[in-house]
Every structure is written in structure tokens, then in C-alpha cells.
Amino acid sequence: MLAKRIIPCLDIKNGRTVKGVNFVDLRDAGDPVELAEIYSREGADELVFLDISATEERRKTLVNMVRSVAEKINIPFTVGGGISSVEDVDILLNNGADKVSINSSAVKNPQLINDLAQKFGSQCVVVAIDAKQIDGQWIVHLVGGKVPTELNLFDWAVEVAERGAGEILFTSMDNDGTKNGFANEALAKLSELVNIPIIASGGAGNIQHFVDSFKEGKADAALAASVFHFKEIEIKALKQELRKNGVEVRL
């Protein structure tokens, strides 16, 4: 059985980490490279960087950050945010990113998934899906969850997998930020429908939530931000607890 993965997520704006980070020993809480090193040391399996800046300079800034992170850590990392072309991906992968995450651009142009998978291989194509329940249906949303689409989560996930995505990063917007646990029912259904790894996101509040995402949600990986950034959960302790609960992890 493949080990389950724990993935801290960092929001990046203009080359800096945003959304509050509370590491006492940090010289500069806004430095994504320093944070990446700490998480890598603490036992994170992978990292995700989501670029939320919208400046003209963003690509250059992002490339510089990716290069610096790649020099400092030896765990895989994914970069997402504003990626909409083969050229965007080429630049990021050439500068050291292991994977890219696409979201809105995949919905607007599904062929992009095929193109990226064909050119770079499925293993580096992550499709992020943000969804929330409306009248009992899981509906895909865009623009950080502000814009609803006509797409059903499960139909879209199947299409994404068929087009060559290597992984799906599913964020439940109903759970995101609540610290009440992941959307395990939806996660389990996704795992049944597609045979690519599912990364659970949205709702982590305590260690039990991670246990549940793997055991009930059948997730392959679990992603979180604030519980790690604010030291509410230490990755080493989390992994030891997961192992005690019969979840295979790399210690």
C-alpha cells in the first residue's frame, strides 16, 4: 500500500507567504523558502504553493521563488494559481517545480489537461477542484469559489481523470476554514469513481480529522494550511498518531 501523504499548503502573493504563519523561530514569516525548508525538515511529504497575486510581474516573481525553493528542499512541490498554458507550465517545471495545479483554466479549456499530460506526463498534472453543495448537489466553483459553474463535482472528476490528470486536489468549500473535518463522504465517492490519487483539502482542525480523511474518506493525501502554519498540529506528532491508527505514513 502506498504511504498516505501530508501536504502543507502555502498561499503566495508577490513572492511572499500570506495568510499568517506562526513559527517562533522564523526570521521572516513571509519567506516561502524558509517555510518550505522547515516543513521539509518536519516531515511534510510534499508542499503546495498557490500563487494568488495578480500583478504583471507575477510570473517572474513566481519563477524566482520556485527556483529558490527547489534549491533548498528535497520533497516534491506543486505550484498553482493563474496557470493557463503549456508555456506557463514549461517555465515552472524547468525551474524546479515537480507538479503544477490547474483549476479555473481546466474548466474553461478542458483540452489543456490533455495537452499538459501529453507534453509533460500525467504525474505532474494536478487538477484542483473547488466544490460546494447546492440543493444536495456538489457543484464546481471557480475564482476561489466565488463563481458557480454548471458542473457536477463527480462528473467533472471523471472527465479530468479521463483527460490525463495525475491527481485531483478536492477542496470542499463547505468545510474549508471550519476546522470541523474533511468532506469524507464526497472524498470516498471520488476515490471509488476515479483511479488516480485524491488529495483532501478543506476542514482540517485536529489529528482525528486526518485519520478520518484516510480511513473514511479514502483519500491518498491530506492538505492543510492554518493548522500547520499556526503550530496547532505538528507534522511529526500527526504522523505518529496516524501510524497508531493503522494509517501507513513515512515517518
UniProtKB/Swiss-Prot annotation:
<dbReference type="GO" id="GO:0000105">
    <property type="term" value="P:L-histidine biosynthetic process"/>
</dbReference>
<dbReference type="Pfam" id="PF00977">
    <property type="entry name" value="His_biosynth"/>
</dbReference>
<comment type="function">
    <text>IGPS catalyzes the conversion of PRFAR and glutamine to IGP, AICAR and glutamate. The HisF subunit catalyzes the cyclization activity that produces IGP and AICAR from PRFAR using the ammonia provided by the HisH subunit.</text>
</comment>
<dbReference type="GO" id="GO:0005737">
    <property type="term" value="C:cytoplasm"/>
</dbReference>
<feature type="active site">
    <location>
        <position position="130"/>
    </location>
</feature>
<comment type="pathway">
    <text>Amino-acid biosynthesis; L-histidine biosynthesis; L-histidine from 5-phospho-alpha-D-ribose 1-diphosphate: step 5/9.</text>
</comment>
<dbReference type="GO" id="GO:0016829">
    <property type="term" value="F:lyase activity"/>
</dbReference>
<feature type="active site">
    <location>
        <position position="11"/>
    </location>
</feature>
<comment type="similarity">
    <text>Belongs to the HisA/HisF family.</text>
</comment>
<dbReference type="InterPro" id="IPR050064">
    <property type="entry name" value="IGPS_HisA/HisF"/>
</dbReference>
<protein>
    <recommendedName>
        <fullName>Imidazole glycerol phosphate synthase subunit HisF</fullName>
        <ecNumber>4.3.2.10</ecNumber>
    </recommendedName>
</protein>
<dbReference type="InterPro" id="IPR006062">
    <property type="entry name" value="His_biosynth"/>
</dbReference>
<keyword id="KW-0368">Histidine biosynthesis</keyword>
<keyword id="KW-0963">Cytoplasm</keyword>
<comment type="subunit">
    <text>Heterodimer of HisH and HisF.</text>
</comment>
<dbReference type="InterPro" id="IPR004651">
    <property type="entry name" value="HisF"/>
</dbReference>
<keyword id="KW-0456">Lyase</keyword>
<keyword id="KW-0028">Amino-acid biosynthesis</keyword>
<dbReference type="GO" id="GO:0000107">
    <property type="term" value="F:imidazoleglycerol-phosphate synthase activity"/>
</dbReference>
<dbReference type="InterPro" id="IPR013785">
    <property type="entry name" value="Aldolase_TIM"/>
</dbReference>
<dbReference type="InterPro" id="IPR011060">
    <property type="entry name" value="RibuloseP-bd_barrel"/>
</dbReference>
